[in-house]
Amino acid sequence: MVQAPSVYVCGFVERPDAPPKDACLHLDPLTVKSQLPLKKPLPLTVEHLPDAPVGSVFGLYQSRAGLFSAASITSGVFLSLLDSIYHDCDIAQSQRLPLPREPKLEALHAWLPSLSLASLHPDIPQTTADGGKLSFFDHVSICALGRRRGTTAVYGTDLAWVLKHFSDLEPSIAAQIENDANAAKRESGCPEDHPLPLTKLIAKAIDAGFLRNRVETLRQDRGVANIPAESYLKASDAPDLQKPDKALQSPPPASTDPDTMLSGNAGEGATACGGSAAAGQDLISVPRNTFMTLLQTNLDNKPPRQTPLPYAAPLPPFSHQAIATAPSYGPGAGAVAPAGGYFTSPGGYYAGPAGGDPGAFLAMDAHTYHPHPHPPPAYFGLPGLFGPPPPVPPYYGSHLRADYVPAPSRSNKRKRDPEEDEEGGGLFPGEDATLYRKDIAGLSKSVNELQHTLQALRRETLSYGHTGVGYCPQQGPCYTHPGPYGFQPHQSYEVPRYVPHPPPPPTSHQAAQAQPPPPGTQAPEAHCVAESTIPEAGAAGNSGPREDTNPQQPTTEGHHRGKKLVQASASGVAQSKEPTTPKAKSVSAHLKSIFCEELLNKRVA
């Protein structure tokens, strides 16, 4: 067991069971085997910064699980910086496992949890012009996120404790690493402390904050490396930043809340922001437009709320004794009763058993006013004869007593916000706007409407061809009248709708071609290709020569050394050095080209 004041860092720098997506990151097993063991230690840097060396890599080892790296951090300036970072970093101080407090180790696991190997690009020959050979391995860096999967770093002051976390590592290789570490400790003298470029380190930390799904990717790397949970790794922990002495205080503002700082990453947002509410459940991120569409669809599919029908009182019994003569119509038949009373019909009304004689019919003068507020009931079958008729329920539908049922309430439907990708306000630096989120259904509908309109105009134009106005032969030139009714150069059809006088006789070279159609046949449609030609390249807005977006790979020796290396750090400078693929054509230019092709196909047909 090796004890040293320095910090050891070990981990896989390449895993064959998780091949990278970029072809330049693949390592040839034969080439790797020819370069091992290392003839001299490799530099250990931070984020591939050449002016930020913090230690040395004393060995690279080929195991069954992949290429394994073992290094030590000996820079006193860097170790002192880690102590200062720990006291001001809440994520570094968060700990849920019963492990001893190690400020340096916890700060390293929170800041630089991955390893990145810088090797020679596979397209660059290892043999130089003077017959020398270039070193295939250049350096190893500790970084925020590696481009190869399974490259999780484990830090510790005890080398045996560090190697114990890699269950895929053979015991023989672990013993060889301990022997090489003892030999490197004896051979190395007093380490030199170089001043660190703090500005560059801060810039790299800012870049790492905008890596998409960084925490989720770190979880994946930890699973690929098969590292147990008994470590200082922060990738799978949702830190509890609630301190006991601040439990009764108000929550901090949003600008300094650590949960808010972690909400920029999709994976951390699911754990840190979800917190105890998620209770360990797996959460997924859904785009805002998709969520609003699902919510609105759920509201629209709800059945409408049925209102109960009002209770209708039973109608009074019909009696033939109440039948009387039809009311007479006179000048006062349309009088309006004042408020509080009613008018009786001209023939009287039925008094009922309360009046003495069950069949008594009280005769009243026409339109006699009665002060009591409730008129006598009108019997079924004779409305209006024995008092005012009952109010007729409003008719909605096919049933007389059908009530109005309101449509499903849409009060909770809110207006959609404008797309942030279209305005460019919701994009992080370095991200591209997803143009294909635009609604193409409206544009397709407009294209269909234009096609139907063009077909209608074509049919209408063909109908004018039988009226004797004339037509142009299929291969002949088009007739253009110079007057106000003449054919305009930007119209889509050749035959004018109205010609005030017959066209002039064709010239000698046209007379041989202009032949009238046979009887009973329809005149063919003329083609004016020169007047309505729509160049397909012009629709896309690219009139000049295109620039070459694929620069050639540097193969000469005169180029800079940095252009020959493949750096496997996600936030390093390697991404800016590699050639970028041309961006996809915009949606608007694509739709314009489709529309022009449709117009040309319709005209040829």
Swiss-Prot record:
InterPro entries linked: Herpes_virus_sf, Peptidase_S21
Alphabetically ordered keywords of this record: Host cytoplasm, Host nucleus, Hydrolase, Phosphoprotein, Protease, Serine protease, Viral capsid assembly, Viral release from host cell
Site-annotated residues for Cleavage: 235-236, 568-569
BP terms from Gene Ontology: nuclear capsid assembly; proteolysis; viral release from host cell
Ranges where the record places region Disordered: 235-275, 403-432, 489-588
Family: Belongs to the herpesviridae capsid scaffolding protein family.
Protein name, as recorded: Capsid scaffolding protein
Source species: Epstein-Barr virus (strain AG876) (HHV-4)
Organism placement in taxonomy: Viruses, Duplodnaviria, Heunggongvirae, Peploviricota, Herviviricetes
